[in-house]
């Protein structure tokens, strides 16, 4: 009876040691995963901030280019579709529409 009790206690102790080691291993894995996720989020945030800075620097130039394209389109539209005899009226008084060209009053 004494031998079997000591074997049971030994088995129980080994099981508890193994359980504790498994728990520590799982905890380390969880900590590493959380650390990796935090690090990835931080790197992503830094990359996004850098990209946003570049876009914010380029935005005025892009808006200017867009405005120039719009003006160029209006000039082309008024020049090619203006039915008015007086070409000086091409200076877009009203925005162009499909029905009425911009150079007409």
UniProtKB/Swiss-Prot annotation:
PTM: Contains 3 disulfide bonds.
Record keyword Secreted present: yes
Keywords: Disulfide bond, Neurotoxin, Secreted, Signal, Toxin
Location, primary (coarse class): secreted
GO molecular function: toxin activity
Domain of life: Eukaryota
Subcellular location: Secreted
Tissue localization of expression: Expressed by the venom gland.
Signal sequence range: 1-21
Family: Belongs to the scolopendra neurotoxin 10 family.
Protein name: Putative neurotoxin 10
Biological source species: Scolopendra mutilans (Chinese red-headed centipede)
Organism ancestry: Eukaryota, Metazoa, Ecdysozoa, Arthropoda, Myriapoda
